């Protein structure tokens, strides 16, 4: 059944029907469409816009359809134009003429916006739950690796010694921001659009606040033109997902590097690796590589929506039907990526000894030698020059800083004493960095405590979301 057609004298071409149809992708919103319709028809009955007995009969029919769809007894007809027309035509088949009163006082324009917002509200909560599961994994990893020394890098060159916990907690901060962004996005999503009609509301005395209350929205939208032409909520969601995927991609890149034979910092579990069809020895980090690749896919979904919306006049235009495939793909891709990535890092093995050995080379304690001289009264710029010359000497002689004798140290400055050896010990280098945000154990403990509190607080916020 089509929801329109009275003014047409010819049947629409089959090719146009196929081109126009959205049932193949908007059918996933059948629950939201039915729940929204139940709230709408309940209001119609309470406001005496339709007889109350008709309202109850329609609601009962909608509940029956929902139950049968959930059980798989009723199958969605893919020849329908969209999920809205399928639900309404099925309702009329079930209960008769009263079903035709369901659409009183609304348009598909405000209906589809409502469905999408309801769907997104539920999906965002699922996404946040999965990010929190990932954060719990990072919390455990960092708690177990407070003293696991590794090299920190800038420009992919060894820079200063840090701990694996410090490195892992850097990503936890990124994911904390992702959760905060999604929660913030949820606030703007939480505005009920139904009642906006096609663009100019309706002449029926509907009660939008009642529908909003029934559906668990915090408020109603204030301008009907904006309500039906707005897709900011979808674009903002995809923006949040793009940033989240970027963080997963950066982490994945490091997982890939760390798992190479050249690094061997970690070993991925067999259950999260794949092999080669020709090279028997291969163990490939496909999960990390796919996360990295799928990030571009989510970026593409965002660009699709931005491009669709960039030149549209008010109010609704059919171009906006193109929002759902991109939105749903971005949601599904991100959710699967988070869950799979979490399993990968939860099961990977950490090679602590190789991390420490790597941190011991590459002059990662050079900055600490300069800081040592500063504490002895040497200006930092002079200390920097002295240590630069010392490093050049080490390179020429094939030595590390730790292997220099005191007399060799004194060749570069008479400020060097026996306590230099304690100052350049890697653990000392780390423990001296007690500043908030640093890699020392005391600082890491604070970061871990903050992460633990954040996880608990975020779970509490989730419980309060309608």
From Swiss-Prot:
Presence of keyword Amino-acid biosynthesis: yes
Q: Where is this protein found?
A: Cytoplasm
Q: Cite a single GO MF annotation.
A: argininosuccinate lyase activity
EC number(s) given by UniProt: 4.3.2.1
Under InterPro entries, the record lists: Arg_succ_lyase_C, Argininosuccinate_lyase, Fumarase/histidase_N, Fumarate_lyase_CS, Fumarate_lyase_fam, Fumarate_lyase_N, L-Aspartase-like
**Catalysed reactions listed for this entry:** 2-(N(omega)-L-arginino)succinate = fumarate + L-arginine
GO CC annotations on file: cytosol
Query: Which major enzyme category is it?
Result: lyase
Give GO terms for biological process: arginine biosynthetic process via ornithine; L-arginine biosynthetic process
Q: What SUPFAM superfamilies is this protein classified in?
A: L-aspartase-like
Record-stated family: Belongs to the lyase 1 family. Argininosuccinate lyase subfamily.
In its UniProt entry, what is this protein called?
Argininosuccinate lyase
Q: Which organism is it from?
A: Clostridium perfringens (strain 13 / Type A)
